[in-house]
Amino acid sequence: MKGNNRMKVIVVGGGAAGMMAAIAAAESGHQVELLERNEKLGKKIYITGKGRCNVTNACDLEEFFTNIVSNEKFLYSSIYQYDNQAVMDFFESNGCKLKVERGNRVFPVSDHASDVTKALADKMHDLGVKITLHCKVEDLILKEDGSVGGVVTAKGEKKIADRVVFATGGLSYEPTGSDGSGIRILEKYGHKIAETKPALVPFELKEDVGARLQGLALKNVNFSIKNGKKKVYDGFGEMLFTHFGISGPLVISASSYYVKQLYGKEVKCSIDLKPALTEEMLDKRILREFEENKNKQFKNALDKMFPSKLIPVMIELSEINPEKKINEVTKEERKRLVTLIKNWELTITGTRGFREAIITQGGVAVKGVNPSTMESKVIPGLYLAGEMLDIDALTGGFNLQLAWSTGHLAGISLE
């Protein structure tokens, strides 16, 4: 790019979306400065995927869109412009070798999230992007015509620019710098904001089973949430009991649907401990177990059916006398046990807060953003990317892909 087309661009936020936007803008020939409030870049990247960084998901795009929870249509342009394969190619060609694991989740071969940040930082360095750390942005500078003219830092410094990209994140994992300040700045200038809520987050329960079963993981179970008779979520996988309630991959995914439709409401959830068996099949299996243990007490005959930690809870909930001999357990009591195993109901009272949430649901309403360019419809010359937007997806590398895609589109669209 030559002459008058070369612009001074400021990118606010050194996370996934901001770094990708800075790279795309610099590759387009612009003079780019990236401002990051923290002492290092990519602070949140370091903790994603338990420190391994789930870079993206390698599934086909049709399946990819089914994993987006909020505003998938808004994301068509950005994802088709810069899809998961493009992201994988970027990292592979910039010194970060990747591998695909279960569920098409993509990780660095090294299992170190730091390699992801290093690839981005090295690329920015090669392209001449100026990086300014410890620099928090507190306001925008607007020109007389209402278009963006730069930013004002927390130290009162005015940084003039032709274009500004905002990629300041949501509210989750606040210690990484995601405090929602960028969203509040945009609200001040007229952007509509969808209510921000913690998502991909553990549940708190009314019952005390969490404390009693703390640390117990249940694998290959079915978990569902109902709002009256309507199922809000129904999924299969692994969950975990914690001191406050439940967590684990299955619960974390379910939370995004709960937060979207039922946030703050007390609702019933159900665990099917044996989803591969119908009630009839399960009853036959229990009969067989009972036949083999007919002279044992009920409390001593369940070790093949449940993990040892779960047995006292199941006995209590079944309301069968633990001292009772197996051959004295009635058909009605057995049916009660079958129903409990297939439909163990618990009460969700709410979610944990932003400090434990993987992402933020809500943010800058997408109606105020051009999906083909990521430019603000409210402030010309301002572009938005990443988690500060009202976009979110399930776990598995999908949310980082949204950051890469929207960041890249913002960076190539500066005009």
Task: List the predicted regions and their residue ranges.
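N-terminal Rossmann-like FAD-binding beta1-loop-alpha1 element of flavoenzymes
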Residues: 8-34, 410-414
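Glycine-rich FAD pyrophosphate-binding loop
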Residues: 26-50
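Feature captures the FAD/FMN-dependent oxidoreductase FAD-binding
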Residues: 81-163
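An anion/pyrophosphate-binding glycine-rich loop and adjacent beta-alpha core
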Residues: 39-47, 55, 61-62, 192-197, ...
